[in-house]
């Protein structure tokens, strides 16, 4: 008796803005089947599609040689979509890998490419050590790298696009003994592969099962390795049914293509909030343990230690960092606010020490924050970043506003912040951007403008707090730069401290910056900023998972039941997920009301609930040594930051 394995795949074609479904074109399809006998190189069989009559199936894929596998294909129309179901049946035990390609009508050189959360345009902002056109113009990758298991190709000249998305029950994965070359899986996986190829100058969608990565596999930051092809056992008499979906549409530009595709993917996967027993109040109570146990109070700068911390002991380190990973001042404000609201004298006392020591010892001669100090080595960063400085001011404004609303004032802090904002005005370039890095004498170290939106936030906050229109005008100039160089070009890059690649935080920061400006604007100006926020938000959303990747038994994240929907990929170069969200959920709820778009608020709820899953408390420490220490680097795919790999955290924890 045949066993139909529940790994379903079909192809569906739909047109955006056009009536009726597209016709499946067999002449545009290519396929191959690779079979491997253990201990021997795999043999690849090119396949030819033959039309059938008087059969349940419409087509059969055939090889020139006799092979121990039958491959049938059925085409059906559902609503405005065309579905193609491929069924493989083994005549004897085989280890197989199936691949199909569909040619578009697009010249490869005219196209931009999109694999959500991993590949944007041609990834040319990344170096050749990461996946990009620098290495090849054809790439296929395993599906769990992607926030949606989809590949999209956008023809800029024809203003058309085509996507392929996997439709399957992603319920399992299997371990392999190695990560490159031909690998036989230890069990059954749900993971296939997807990507794009240049077929004689024509762009083609490529996809298959089980997973494959070519021409290289990406194993850790800036480290490419030889390609990998996985082979899964299909026993004699067993069948496997596979399903993909092809979607076609039109878009004025790459941004419209991405926004249409995100909406299509959202409607396809329909992610639901993740059910946990953790209320917001309980979550905050658990997280407050970090504020107590991580406090370091015997240094010139007091701080909560969360940078470069080991997950197996969570011992405090010597690193005090104002923004970026450390967020010392924002942690202090969160502890301060929570302490007042919950009558926690211990939290208030520690937070006050952080603010007091930074006020006295935390500034450079020119008035910048000492943004990174390592007390173990004595190292102090002398090259400043607009991001860390901005995030420090952002935190202090939250503190000052809270204090003012509760009848307390801090004129010394106000003077410090005002001085920093005045120096910001000197740093700003004529076109509105801010340099990414600079020295205390304002000499420029890195002129890249990708981090500019991080400065918009404190400038708007400074305008609201001090009623100083100079700061608002400066913030508006940043928006002019963002619109011209990032948002209009759909090119969100280098928001981090050193990498230049496309990353989630660049679009998230751009959306937050224009959101802040919309809140302090009226009329046409407000409408304009709101539109920019929406555009940037779609790109930020594209990084967040709409589906749950499978894990193999023994991989900790899978064993504790992690659902990846709602978590965000980090960047083109760093293929892990994290909890970076900050105000983005509030922005999505705001946009939902502004545009009567329920998807935004619904997904904000998915994000908010999903972020609670790895809350570490006694009996549910999730691989972390201490209660309340929530990890950042969560390795969900076949990539690692140098240790552990899929299903685990990096051995270091960033709070």
State the predicted function of each range.
Residues 321-339, 374-421, 448-459, 501-518, ...:
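Aromatic-rich carbohydrate-recognition surfaces in CAZymes
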């Amino acid at each position: 008796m045949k066993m139909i394995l529940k790994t379903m795949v079909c192809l569906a074609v739909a047109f955006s803005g056009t009536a009726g479904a597209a016709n499946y074109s067999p002449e545009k399809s290519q396929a191959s089947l690779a079979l491997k006998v253990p201990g021997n190189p795999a043999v690849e069989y090119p396949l030819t599609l033959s039309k059938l009559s008087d059969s349940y199936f419409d087509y059969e894929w055939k090889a020139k040689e006799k092979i121990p596998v039958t491959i049938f294909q059925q085409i059906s129309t559902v609503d405005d979509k065309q579905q193609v179901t491929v069924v493989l049946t083994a005549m004897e035990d085989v280890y197989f890998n199936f691949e199909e390609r569909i040619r578009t009508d697009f010249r490869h050189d005219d196209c931009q490419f999109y694999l959500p959360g991993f590949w944007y345009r041609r990834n040319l902002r990344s170096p050749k050590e990461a996946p990009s056109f620098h290495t090849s113009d054809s790439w296929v990758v395993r599906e769990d790298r992607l926030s949606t298991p989809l590949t999209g190709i956008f023809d800029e000249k024809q203003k058309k696009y085509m996507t392929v998305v996997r439709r399957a029950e992603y319920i399992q994965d299997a371990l392999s003994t190695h990560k490159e070359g031909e690998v036989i899986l230890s069990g059954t996986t749900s993971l296939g592969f997807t990507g794009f190829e240049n077929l004689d100058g024509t762009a083609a969608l490529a996809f298959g099962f089980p997973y494959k990565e070519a021409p290289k596999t990406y194993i850790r930051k800036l480290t490419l390795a030889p390609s990998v092809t996985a082979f899964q056992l299909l026993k004699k008499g067993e069948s496997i049914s596979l399903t993909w979906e092809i979607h076609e549409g039109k878009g004025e530009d790459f941004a419209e293509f991405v926004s249409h595709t995100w909406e299509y993917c959202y409607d396809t996967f329909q992610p639901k909030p993740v059910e946990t027993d953790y209320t917001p109040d309980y979550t905050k109570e658990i997280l407050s343990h970090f504020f107590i146990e991580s406090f370091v109070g015997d240094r010139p700068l007091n701080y909560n230690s969360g940078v470069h911390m080991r997950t197996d002991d969570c011992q405090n380190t010597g690193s005090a960092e104002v923004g970026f990973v450390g967020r010392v001042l924002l942690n202090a404000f969160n502890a301060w606010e929570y302490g007042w609201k919950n009558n926690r004298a211990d939290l208030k006392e520690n937070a006050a020490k952080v603010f007091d020591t930074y006020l006295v010892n935390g500034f450079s001669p020119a008035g910048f924050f000492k943004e990174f100090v390592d007390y173990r080595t004595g190292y102090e960063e002398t090259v400043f970043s607009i991001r860390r400085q901005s995030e420090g001011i952002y935190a202090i404004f939250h503190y000052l506003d809270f204090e003012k609303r509760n009848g307390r004032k801090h004129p010394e802090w106000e003077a410090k912040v005002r001085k920093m904002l005045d120096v910001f005005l000197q740093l700003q370039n004529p076109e509105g951007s801010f340099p990414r890095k600079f020295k205390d004498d304002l000499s420029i170290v890195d002129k890249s403008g990708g981090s500019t939106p991080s400065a918009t936030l404190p400038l708007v906050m400074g305008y609201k707090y001090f009623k100083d229109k100079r700061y608002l005008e400066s913030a508006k100039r940043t928006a002019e730069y963002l619109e011209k160089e990032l948002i209009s070009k759909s090119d969100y890059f280098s928001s981090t401290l050193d990498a230049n690649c496309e990353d989630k935080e660049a679009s998230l920061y751009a959306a937050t910056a224009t959101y802040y400006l919309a809140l302090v604007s009226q009329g046409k100006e407000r409408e304009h900023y709101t539109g920019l926020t929406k555009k940037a938000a779609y790109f930020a959303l594209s990084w967040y998972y709409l589906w749950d990747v499978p894990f193999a038994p023994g991989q900790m994240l899978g064993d504790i039941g992690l659902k990846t929907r709602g978590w965000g990929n980090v960047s083109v170069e760093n293929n892990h997920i994290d909890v970076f969200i900050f105000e983005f959920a509030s922005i999505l709820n705001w946009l939902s009301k502004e545009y009567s778009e329920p998807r935004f608020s619904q997904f904000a709820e998915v994000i908010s609930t999903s972020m609670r899953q790895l809350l570490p408390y006694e009996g549910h420490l999730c691989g972390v040594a201490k209660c309340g220490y929530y990890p950042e680097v969560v390795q969900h795919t076949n990539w690692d930051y140098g240790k552990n790999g899929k299903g685990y955290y990096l051995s270091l924890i960033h709070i």
